[in-house]
Amino acid sequence: MINSNDKNESDTFGIIRKILSERIMVLDGAMGTEIQKFKLKDNDYRGEEFKDFPHELGGNNDLLSLTQPHIIREIHCKYLEAGADFIETNTFNGNIFSQADYKMEHLVKRINIESARLAKSACEEYTKKDPSRPRFVCGAVGPTNKTASISPSVERPEARNVLFDELVSGYLEQVEALVEGGIDVILVETVFDSLNCKAALFAIEEFFKTYSPRLPVFVSGTIVDKSGRTLSGQTGEAFYTSVASANLMVFGLNCALGAQEMRPFLQNISKCSECYVSCYPNAGLPNTFGGYDETPEMMAEQIKEFAESGLLNIVGGCCGTSPDHIRAFCNAIEGIAPRAIPTLVPNTTLSGLEPLVFTKELNFVNVGERCNVSGSRRFANLIKANKYEEALSVARQQVEAGAQIIDINMDEGMIDAVAAIQKFLFFIGSEPEISKVPIMLDSSNFDVVEAGLKCVQGKCIVNSISLKVGEELFIKQAKIVKQYGASVVVMAFDENGQATSKEEKVRICYRSYKILTEQVGFYPQDIIFDPNILTIATGLEEHNNYGVEFIEATREIKALMPLTRVSGGVSNLSFSFRGNEPLREAMHSAFLYYAIAAGMDMGIVNAGALPIYDDIPKDLLKLVEDAILNRTNDATEKLLEYAQANNKSEKANVEVEEWRNKPVSERIAHALVKGITTYIIEDTEEARNTLPSSLSVIEGPLMGGMNVVGDLFGAGKMFLPQVIKSARVMKKAVAHLIPFMEEEKRLKRLEKGNDEAAEDEPDNAGVVVLATVKGDVHDIGKNIVGVVLGCNNYKVIDIGVMTPCEKIVEAIIANKADVVGLSGLITPSLDEMIYVASELERLKFKIPLMIGGATTSQIHTAVKISPHYSQPTVHVLDASRSVTVVQSLLDPNNKEVFAEDVSQQYAELREKHYASLKDRKYTSLEKARQHCVKVNWKTIQPVKPTFLGTQVFKEYSLEKLVTKIDWNPFFVTWQLRGKYPNRGYPRIFNDETVGAEAKKLFDDAQTMLKEIVDKKLLNARGVIGFYPANSIDEDIIIYDHNDDETRSKPIATLFGLRQQNEKETDEPYIAIGDYIAPVSSGVKDYIGLFAVSSGFGLEDMVEKYKKENDDYSSIMAKALADRLAEALAEAVHEDVRREHWAYEKDQALSNEDLFKIKYKGIRPAPGYPAQPDHTEMKTIWSLMNVNENTSIELTDHMAMLPGAAVCGVYFSHEHAKYFSVGKITKEQIESYASRKQITKEEAERWLSSILSYDRLPLVK
């Protein structure tokens, strides 16, 4: 609270408030990047005290407060000198969870005390220098390396790697030590999980129960990306709502984003926050190398705009910022008034992943009642049977039906309610479509309530407490609820029992209100009264007025305590008529009509099952209103008569596919949008029989439906797999119509008395020719683009893979193409694209050129391709952009403007590119060699493989490969990308936007995989080889496998390239040759080679799907073959490490660790960053007779056939790592060409993507 007069407050509160009323205050910048500038080694971290500590300590920055305190104090002083008002202690990881990584949990107290003392002494020094500008120490409480809201296990969404109580204990230890060390402020920062933060705030409150005076508490959350959410999925506003009741002095955002990206989220926080607001962004987003590029001047300009817009009270810097940044911030904000705290109308606000604000527009808030073991037999049975995932469907249905809050009740004699509610809440936490709404924890057992409070990151509701337990226990329970930050339902009960009359209801509620607001400190808007909805029409006269008593009590409560809310369990009203759901629902609807008018704000209802008041039959409405309002003496009797005459124990719930009853055009559109092929033939036939011609069916309902698909895809409401399924439906329909169209054409020709083919083709938006260029066999992306364009009424002519330029030219002419698109995956394709562009220019074509594929980029298109073709040349990032680009290129009104915009943009890119080449610095090849990877080969004895020569495997187990699949690239192929916290497999399934479609796609993939394995539709095979080897500089000399002892017969050389980008540090300039013992060392080393493919049989699969007009299955097969090829490479490499080379015999890694390369050795591939020259593949093919042994072919352009193939080189060196050669100079190109005995021009052609200078393409 900003203007708190709490007598327990420290003097710091008043001082900081006064300064904040006058100016924007400044926090320090990054600690980690400043520490990095000292280039500390492991011994520096150890110091004298820990020199013999048995675990590695490098990177434990918090430990430096003990071992290198002068460095930490120096950094503090630099920030203070730059103008910081607040400096943070060096304790971001000063908790038992993070220190456990270093086996240093026992040092947590010391680290925090000493860190606080270091910062305090620095602040005191600078305050003494200028007493008019006091400096303050913020005790940094980091997020820990655990998350209480996210499961660490794919298979067990309810699992957690830390629990609330464990977090509280860990945070309490840290807070106690920081305060002992002398901090002025507690800063809970970089919060990525609100439940972790709530645990920290709970611990802080526990601490201040016994310690005085209180210190100010700041909280700073982290929005992880442009989706505007924390890692655990909450929006910034929802996070603020979760912690707002903790009497924070400051709430803000830090880390993950640069200032520009953070601005919209900061603005939202600034609007809703009733405390001071802070922000300390990163120095921009991380660059390619993980660094930060925004200069102090750049950031200061953005910070100044924040301040001028009234968004800031405190500003600082996070990752990548320095004392220079802080100095620039101080100068930028000087003289700008601080943000004014907004005066907001007090309102009840709750949160799940998203906030729920009780505005007037909401009218009435539905609390879903079906997750109640007492009220739903189905839910109870699922919980008892331990079927929690199925039970989630009950909650999901409630949300989908309109519930804005979910009530959860586990009170049942045969259920362990504490365990059940925690487990179910953890399951819900992994389901964003459910956890987006707030939770109501419903139990008569307070232990169950508190157990639930420890599992929910949002601001929830406790249902309920009451005075029936006595005033002392009521207050105790209320204080606990408040400490967890929840709102509370208070029942109209007291020591004498349940209130039934209006007067008793109002009296008990008012008494409860006074206690909660005056003795416990509850805000009125966090109090929800339940004045007891009791059962009417029971046959007992005294019950007849219960409805009226509730309605009138509600009216008075709202007049007496207007900021509070009124709720109730609506189904209690009709309990007498259990089993007659239509009657009960009519009673509920009519009751709410009057109760809402009296001021009832919310109620526990079966969301989605309430009829509209005006839709209730008039005769029934009169009966239920007579009973509810107690208008006649015989109301109960008449209602009972009606119930007996109209007894319907169950609603007729026949699942009818209603869309099948719609007109045929709507059925076709529905089938296209939903991807349903079941009825498309019969619907198409029906349309053909009702429309003038078969062509009319295509141009009418089919294209109409596809237009809807195109619009939905363009608006982001459909995703790529759905679009491809739509195309499958379309193709099946068209295939059915083609014979009829041919017959109609024949009859027309007969009518005209000639045999000339009629040209009544369906209208289209334009003709697009697509081709994978010569030498390249990869076409998944191109095929997807073709489908998407086809769905948007473009006629697509796909001329396949490995397409020579002349064939592309012929297709353009023959089909009168409006646009041509070139695709390629491998680096040599880039030169082929340049050649095609040059030929199109020479032949004076006037159509636009689109460039796409994994190896292409906007900068390459602008610099290398566009200058060779005078017509519009556009790089298309993925299929989702293709439609917009083609539309823009062909739009008669705007195509010239679009082309000019692209041309201007590409000209600017070229200018920047050439300017950057001038600015980059490269070291000479000789100097780079002198600074190669240093290895003491005298101490290393390389492991000899178990055999030398080659080994062929003709049929690798597909079952084993399925278990090794990395699914993340699979979803990238289909252009499905989740947002935090749901990026990557399997969390993508939880993503609000793409999760459902990703799961469907994954299920389809599993079905096809099973068929592939069961029927052996694909064959996985390959060859591996091991050879004696030594290195000379960058190159690896390979000897005959029968010449291991003398090594006198070199049989081949693998040529390498060395990094030349000048480095600011003493890091080595790496080449692959560094990982093999040099010839001069005398050490016998070895190298491995491999080539594998899982693509044998793929052509047959694709051909079958093409005949069935099934693009979806065709693309799926290719995507799975690619995944299986990568899995094969991973599996064989594992076999090599454990058996064939056997340098890690006992290794047993999880898939996750495999994909993260947590093993010794690497397997780089020619054509990739460590050796970008594809022609090195020829050496692999020659040495191992790959073509003869496996039938994997190599094209002239170094593409492998089948395309689902992987090849590379095995290194066993323990320090070998993947790296990127980066740009190289002409000097190295000349050396490389000379060693390899090729021309300089040929070397430049194959290495064009990494040249540090420009060169002309080869003329063909």
Curated annotation (Swiss-Prot):
Domain Pterin-binding, first and last residues per copy: 364-625
Function: Catalyzes the transfer of a methyl group from methyl-cobalamin to homocysteine, yielding enzyme-bound cob(I)alamin and methionine. Subsequently, remethylates the cofactor using methyltetrahydrofolate.
Residue ranges of domain B12-binding N-terminal in the record: 655-749
Entry-linked InterPro entries: Cbl-bd_cap, Cobalamin-bd, Cobalamin-bd_sf, Dihydropteroate_synth-like_sf, HCY_dom, HCY_dom_sf, Met_Synthase/Corrinoid, Met_synthase_B12-bd
Protein name: Methionine synthase
Record-listed S-adenosyl-L-methionine binding positions: D966, R1163, Y1218, F1219
Record flagged with keyword S-adenosyl-L-methionine: yes
GO process annotations (BP): homocysteine metabolic process; methionine biosynthetic process; methylation; tetrahydrofolate metabolic process
GO MF term set: cobalamin binding; methionine synthase activity; zinc ion binding
PROSITE patterns associated with the record: ADOMET_ACTIVATION, B12_BINDING, B12_BINDING_NTER, HCY, PTERIN_BINDING
Binding residues for Zn(2+): C255, C318, C319
One term under GO cellular component: cytosol
Catalyzed reactions: (6S)-5-methyl-5,6,7,8-tetrahydrofolate + L-homocysteine = (6S)-5,6,7,8-tetrahydrofolate + L-methionine
Cofactor note: Binds 1 zinc ion per subunit.
Entry comment, domain topic: Modular enzyme with four functionally distinct domains. The isolated Hcy-binding domain catalyzes methyl transfer from free methylcobalamin to homocysteine. The Hcy-binding domain in association with the pterin-binding domain catalyzes the methylation of cob(I)alamin by methyltetrahydrofolate and the methylation of homocysteine. The B12-binding domain binds the cofactor. The AdoMet activation domain binds S-adenosyl-L-methionine. Under aerobic conditions cob(I)alamin can be converted to inactive cob(II)alamin.
Domain (AdoMet activation): residue spans on this chain: 916-1256
Keywords: Amino-acid biosynthesis, Cobalamin, Cobalt, Metal-binding, Methionine biosynthesis, Methyltransferase, Repeat, S-adenosyl-L-methionine, Transferase, Zinc
Pfam family, one: S-methyl_trans
Misc note: L-homocysteine is bound via the zinc atom.
EC number: 2.1.1.13
SUPFAM superfamilies the record matches: Cobalamin (vitamin B12)-binding domain, Dihydropteroate synthetase-like, Homocysteine S-methyltransferase, Methionine synthase activation domain-like, Methionine synthase domain
Top-rank lineage group of the source organism: Eukaryota
Cofactor field: methylcob(III)alamin; Zn(2+)
Taxonomic placement: Eukaryota, Amoebozoa, Evosea, Eumycetozoa, Dictyostelia
Main enzyme class: transferase
Segments forming domain B12-binding: 766-883
Homology family: Belongs to the vitamin-B12 dependent methionine synthase family.
